C-alpha cells in the first residue's frame, strides 16, 4: 500500500518547494467539463468537426439542401448545442464533414419545438466508413461510438424523419474517450488534507458540465 507523507507540493527548477494546503474558508467557483485532461488525439477529433455543416432538405439526395448551421469553436470533447434559425419544415437532415476531415463525430441529437428528441426513420449517407463506425453510430444514443470516414472526401451522414419537421435544436459531440462531464451523472469533488481525502461537494452533471 502507498503511505502518504504529507500534503502535495510544487517543486520548482531551483529546488525550492511550495506546499499545497486546502483553504476551505476561501472557495472559488469552478466549471468542470472533463474528468481528465484533453489528449492530443481528443483535440484532433475536435478539430475535425470544425466547420462541419448541418443541412436540411425535402429531397433525399439533398439537391435542395439548406445549410442551417456549422460546428464552430469545437475545442472540448463534450456536447455542444445551438438553435438553428430558418423557416419551414423538412423531411431530411444531414451532417457534412468539412474538408480534410475523417468525420469522427460521436453523436447528433435533433429536437423539435417542444423539446422532444426526434427519432430517425432511416439513416443513410456516404458509404465508405471505417468498419464499426458506420452511419447509424451517429444516432445510436451512445456517445462512445462514432461515425468515421475512410478518407477525407467531405463524407456525410443523413437521416429521414417520420414527417417534415422544423428542427429547433441540434446537439452534437465529437468522437471522445468518455471523460467529459455527462448530463445526469453524479460527481464528487474531494480535496486532500494531511493524510486523507475529504468530500467537499457533490453535484449532478448538466449540459454545461458541473459548477463547483
Question: Which role does the model predict for each range below?
Answer:
Residues 1-66, 74-212:
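Aromatic, loop-rich ligand-recognition surfaces of beta-strand-rich domains
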Residues 71:
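Short, conserved helix/loop micro-motifs enriched in His/Cys and acidic residues
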